[in-house]
């Protein structure tokens, strides 16, 4: 049984950094309405799941968790359970039927209505608010963040790219950029609060545009870098079509902009990219990588790869392996394709690659990328890197964990340092995912 009062709430956040940023906004909205954040779900009268619909396994995780919440509601009938984010936006008709535990639904553009939805749910209704609002950027809301070292700052919401496999345009709507002055106001608050790292967020972050101020993403990134000279500045996620010489030169010219770019490619086959509606060829992607590496010596690159997309032949898969071998990304998010209802692929393409083949191809991709990552990380042994300490290591309270400007995870001996410190670390060992060292 939960022990919190009826106006206490707890948010479980699933999925991407944008969801984490949204949860900070939701917390602020609810606190302004008189609700109190609980430290754990067993101390909350309201439990909210901020969900992700990008992949099938993410949806499965939510459905499994709802079984747990149904058990809690049987013991405490006053408990309110809300499903927020991308899943209800995408699957409204199915959501209430999924579990009797669900009391309310809210989509990414309607979090301002949560106080009213909660009160309606208490009266026995099953309310939902899932309208798209192309004007909603949650301007004027001060997010309530967890921690005081790294902060996510959404600069745009939604996506116009309509990749065939992707549900984001159907869950987060059309692109809309936050006003330049609002972004800079948020950054200035973070600087005044002493944050050490600021990450600019968007589903398609480098298509940012504030036409009233004449500010594109390169100009925004430059302005943020100048406004926060003592902080590291990052951004994610980029689309290859929006990588420009202006943007890369901005990164090169500003020492506090991290020397790391996450640039999803999804497949090494131009034919597969065409079916995916990615809007570029492999040759064009390679040109972008060449531009980046020519202007940013030592840059670390990461990517996304999907195995087994509709119509993928063995030669397409081999092209993906060849691409990984050629470009040698530092790391990659690797998945096999799962159909998302409502997408172009679900409506018009045939999911014709057998699951056993998808899994085999994915494993080959993972094995190759792990080998490449391991080789790259081994090359770092003996070097000294600057690490922003983020937290205690999961291994030991005598160690801290942090990241390099290139986004490599480093575990190092504590030696009196604290989270938030910038530490020069001599790398003494490496795996394919983590560097280990000692302060110097």
Swiss-Prot record:
Cofactor(s) needed by this chain: [4Fe-4S] cluster
Main location: cytoplasm
Gene Ontology MF: a single term: N6-isopentenyladenosine methylthiotransferase activity
Claim: Metal-binding is one of the keywords in the record: yes
Residues annotated for [4Fe-4S] cluster 2 binding in this entry: 159, 163, 166
Domain Radical SAM core: 145-375
Positions annotated to bind [4Fe-4S] cluster 1: 16, 52, 86
Protein name in the entry: tRNA-2-methylthio-N(6)-dimethylallyladenosine synthase
Function recorded in the entry: Catalyzes the methylthiolation of N6-(dimethylallyl)adenosine (i(6)A), leading to the formation of 2-methylthio-N6-(dimethylallyl)adenosine (ms(2)i(6)A) at position 37 in tRNAs that read codons beginning with uridine.
Subcellular location field: Cytoplasm
CDD domains the UniProt entry points to: Radical_SAM
Domain MTTase N-terminal: 7-123
Species this protein is from: Pelodictyon phaeoclathratiforme (strain DSM 5477 / BU-1)
